[in-house]
């Protein structure tokens, strides 16, 4: 049961970091939209934490290849992905 709380804490931490990306107007709109989609996936209560993390990681991994992404945003995305990759059921 402790891992469930750990997973939820990691998801909340990832959401906070992604919210910063969404609220940063210097980030291109398509990247902010992908971050919003990832947040929506992370907040979906019908899926297990690992599935939510995997879905969000797929979105973020795809968008992290965008050449228009500012470097500080890319680092934030990578940090979120590394947090989400530690989530297991």
UniProtKB/Swiss-Prot annotation:
Gene3D superfamilies on file: Ta0600-like
SUPFAM superfamilies tied to this protein: Ta0600-like
Protein name, entry field: UPF0147 protein Msed_2034
Alphabetized InterPro entries for the sequence: Ta0600-like_sf (IPR023130), UPF0147 (IPR005354)
Top-rank taxon: Archaea
HAMAP family (alphabetical): UPF0147
Source organism per UniProt: Metallosphaera sedula (strain ATCC 51363 / DSM 5348 / JCM 9185 / NBRC 15509 / TH2)
Family stated for the protein in its record: Belongs to the UPF0147 family.
